[in-house]
Amino acid sequence: MHLDAALVSAVCGAVGGWFVPALIGRVPEPTPDPEPKPDAEPKEPYTSIAALPGLAWKSAVVSAACAGLVGAAVGLEWVLVILVPLVPLSVALAVVDWRTRLLPTRLVLPATGVAILLGLVGWAVTGDVDDLIRAAIALVVVRSVFWALWWFHSAGMGFGDVRLAALLGFALGQLGWGEVVVGVYSGFLVFALPGLLLAIARRDRGLLKSAFPFGPFMLVGALIGVLVGSAVWSSLFPAWA
């Protein structure tokens, strides 16, 4: 455990998390659907989400905790410069997706571009191109997997999830293939929990068909990948570790 990196990351995460409401409030509203579904509920405005009571301090606490865990797992490495800023962004995306079932392109694509740029800077600083190559391959592979899932079952997954998959693939790829595989797979496992737990608690199998936004669970899975991906991968496939 890297306590120095954990402390620095937690402080940075807390500061970034405090500005989550401001970030959400500046996201432009999407273009209205020309043919909305008759039973579609009105979208909650981003400004209303940004004004939720206590969102700033709650986001700061969650971001600090998650960033601290990331720092403790990774240590004072260049990849931390890529990962820590993604923590408050991930909190913002999770909040927005949970309440609107949308992952704003204005947040995901610029973040992906910045992550790639920082990866290039890391290559220039450290001279190690292996992490960058692995991250680029992971971006393409993970995005392609999610694109295929979206193409064959678009009702269960939005294209925002595909864009987010590219960002997470690149970020996890900076660490290793264990983090990529465990991070992506964990997202699907965690996604299955809410409906299952509700169905068990209420003894209603119909709740298994309840729809939940996928983005927040992808982000939780990515965090799991960062924290235990390498260890899980090494224990399952020691020859590939």
PLM features: residue spans?
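A membrane-topology feature that recognizes alpha-helical transmembrane segments
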Residues: 1-241
